[in-house]
Swiss-Prot record:
A motif (PPXY motif) lies at residues 96-99. A lipid is attached at G2 (N-myristoyl glycine). Its main location: virion. Keywords: Host cell membrane, Host cytoplasm, Host membrane, Host-virus interaction, Lipoprotein, Membrane, Metal-binding, Myristate, Viral budding, Viral budding via the host ESCRT complexes, Viral release from host cell, Virion, Zinc, Zinc-finger. It comes from Ippy mammarenavirus (isolate Rat/Central African Republic/Dak An B 188 d/1970). Late-budding domains (L domains) are short sequence motifs essential for viral particle budding. They recruit proteins of the host ESCRT machinery (Endosomal Sorting Complex Required for Transport) or ESCRT-associated proteins. This is RING finger protein Z. HAMAP family: ARENA_Z.
Length: 101
């Protein structure tokens, strides 16, 4: 009853792919792309993330990542890094506003 990991688990950790910089595409709005929906909830068409051969919305992706690292639809690893196609809409602030209690 030790605190050490089993040999199989240690090998699995060592065999995991290193961070290669691959990021999943995020589609802000898929209304003009045809029948593209989240394959988990079949409702959302915004903030879709490419997961291998299908799309997941951000809500479903967050929920699925809290349960497992594998996609229940394609059984492949879920995307954990996203590639933004457009810059954020909020301008950067040069300095934070002064603190006032």
């Amino acid at each position: 009853m030790g605190q050490n990991q089993s040999r199989d688990k240690q090998k699995a950790i060592q065999n995991q792919p290193k961070d290669t910089g691959n990021r999943a595409d995020i589609i802000p709005d898929a209304t003009g792309m045809g029948p593209e929906f989240c394959k988990s909830c079949w409702f959302e068409r915004r903030s879709l993330v490419a997961c291998n051969n299908h799309y997941l919305c951000m809500n479903c992706l967050t929920l699925l990542l809290s349960v497992s690292e594998r996609c229940p639809i394609c059984k492949l690893p879920l995307p954990q890094k996203l590639k933004l196609t457009s810059s954020p809409s909020a301008p950067p602030s040069p300095s934070p506003p002064p603190y006032s209690p």
